Swiss-Prot record:
Topological domains, Cytoplasmic: 2-12, 94-112, 191-211, 288-301
Superkingdom assignment: Eukaryota
InterPro entries, per the entry: Mitochondrial_Carrier, Mitochondrial_sb/sol_carrier, Mt_carrier_dom_sf
Protein name: Mitochondrial carnitine/acylcarnitine carrier protein
In-chain residues carrying the UniProt-annotated modification N-acetylalanine: 2
N6-acetyllysine modifications at: 148, 157, 170
Length: 301
């Protein structure tokens, strides 16, 4: 007898998504630090080598100069923001799916899943942008040799003192440009892979842990293929001195292409791809397990 479809619960998505986000940050932050440092390093002078020659070089130099804590620099900001951010992300996805269903039995098409995923990206931008701004500033300050901020709270306090609440939301448009299409790809790919990995006659809810890990990991890779160019622009814009880019992302884009070519839009690609699989596998395992527990404890919630 087929299992009766359950109505999508945005509340369960909220709770399980928060835990999944914590798992993602803890596993993925070291290579996120490497990614941001590669994306924001200045062009090298003629005849001089760049500060970092690549992902492994940046990882090695950070570990040697700052220890393991250097790789986790700025993690407090995303940890503080990640529970509500991923909770809202999965809530937005659940809501997006529910809005397109006439009944719980309706199966959504992949374009509909993409649309629901894009809604989740809109939902998360308000939480994501301040955390990304603080995280990026803390991640690059050690490599630049200027320790302006002693930590997350100090950075938040000084940003507010200097720029007011708007200082936290520098880069909002670029965060939207990154997260809306990337979130659509993020969730659509995951649902497609789950369906692909589900044996005939079985439910996607019965997927084994290894298959959940593989589906979550590859979803992260597809997500970042879409997200890297706007992420490079966002990192550069959010860490730039005030007034450097008066026309926003257009100035950043022109400068990058003029000075470093189109390939500069994929700075940090190796770090992102190495990070994407384990971090997102951990995220979706961290989401699926609490969701199963919640469905067992409160099936009608």
């Amino acid at each position: 007898m087929a299992e009766e479809p359950k109505p999508i619960s945005p509340l369960k998505n909220l709770l399980a998504g928060g835990f999944g986000g914590v798992c993602l940050v803890f596993v993925g932050h070291p290579l996120d630090t490497v990614k941001v440092r590669l994306q924001t390093q200045p062009p090298s002078l003629p005849g001089q080598p760049p500060m970092y020659s690549g992902t492994i070089d940046c990882f090695r130099k950070t570990l040697f100069r700052e220890g393991i804590t250097g790789l986790y620099r700025g993690m407090a900001a995303p940890i503080i923001g990640v529970t509500p951010m991923f909770a809202v992300c999965f809530f937005g996805f659940g809501l997006g799916k529910r809005l397109q269903q006439k009944s719980p039995e309706d199966e959504l098409t992949y374009p509909q899943l993409f649309t629901a995923g894009m809604l989740s990206g809109v939902f998360t931008t308000g939480i994501m942008t301040p955390g990304e701004r603080i995280k990026c500033l803390l991640q690059i300050q050690a490599s630049s040799g200027k320790n302006k901020y002693s930590g997350t709270l100090d950075c938040a306090k000084k940003l507010y003192q200097e720029f007011g609440i708007r200082g936290f939301y520098k880069g909002t448009a670029l965060t939207l440009m990154r997260d809306v299409p990337a979130s659509g790809m993020y969730f659509m790919t995951y649902e497609w892979l789950k369906n692909l990995f589900t044996p005939q006659g079985k439910s996607v809810h019965d997927l084994s842990v290894p298959r959940v890990l593989v589906a979550g990991g590859f979803r992260g890779i597809f997500n970042w293929v879409v997200a890297i160019p706007p992420d490079v622009l966002k990192s550069r814009f959010q860490t730039a001195p005030p007034g450097k880019y008066p026309n926003g992302f257009r100035d950043v884009l022109r400068e990058l292409i003029r000075e470093e070519g189109v390939t500069s839009l994929y700075k940090g690609f190796n770090a992102v791809m190495i990070r994407a699989f384990p971090a997102n596998a951990a995220c979706f395992l961290g989401f699926e397990i609490p969701m199963k527990i919640l469905n067992w404890i409160a099936p009608n919630l």
